[in-house]
């Protein structure tokens, strides 16, 4: 993985490389974590995701003790809906130790539709709520990085 990243960096045409790993603690996830500068943890607002977030935080902490260079940039709330349960869970997340990005990604049918079409959401439905949210989140993330946060 590190050789791949070095080759991409040498090429000079890529500013950011994103590894989108499936949930779980696999060899691919560990390799991606060990090769990363930042970790963004996407979380849907439900009990399983909260437990997964706790597990991932413990695993990253363990890897940091073994030389993981990456820092957790924050939690990205996905499939957000305007409900009382989501609002309460959102507030609970924000009380934790892991930073939470201000921009949530709203739930929309366009996201699963784009996966069935095998087309990135940005091309499939750029004006969808989630498409707009992802662009806002990228601005938030890069804005923090560009300002030393």
Regions found by a protein language model. Give the residues of each.
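C-terminal alpha-helix
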Residues: 136-148
């Amino acid at each position: 993985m590190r050789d791949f990243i070095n080759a991409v960096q040498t090429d000079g045409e890529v500013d950011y490389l994103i590894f989108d790993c499936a949930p779980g603690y696999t060899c691919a996830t560990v390799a991606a974590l060990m090769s990363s500068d930042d970790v963004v943890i996407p979380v849907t607002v439900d009990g399983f995701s909260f437990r997964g977030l706790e597990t991932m935080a413990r695993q990253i902490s363990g890897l940091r003790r073994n030389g993981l260079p990456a820092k957790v940039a924050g939690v990205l709330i996905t499939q957000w809906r305007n409900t009382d349960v989501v609002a309460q869970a959102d507030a609970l997340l924000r009380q934790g130790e892991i930073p939470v990005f201000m921009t949530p990604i709203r739930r929309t049918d366009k996201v699963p539709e784009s996966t069935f079409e095998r087309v990135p959401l940005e091309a499939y439905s750029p004006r969808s709520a989630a498409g707009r949210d992802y662009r806002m989140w990228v601005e938030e993330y890069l804005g923090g990085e560009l300002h030393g946060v």
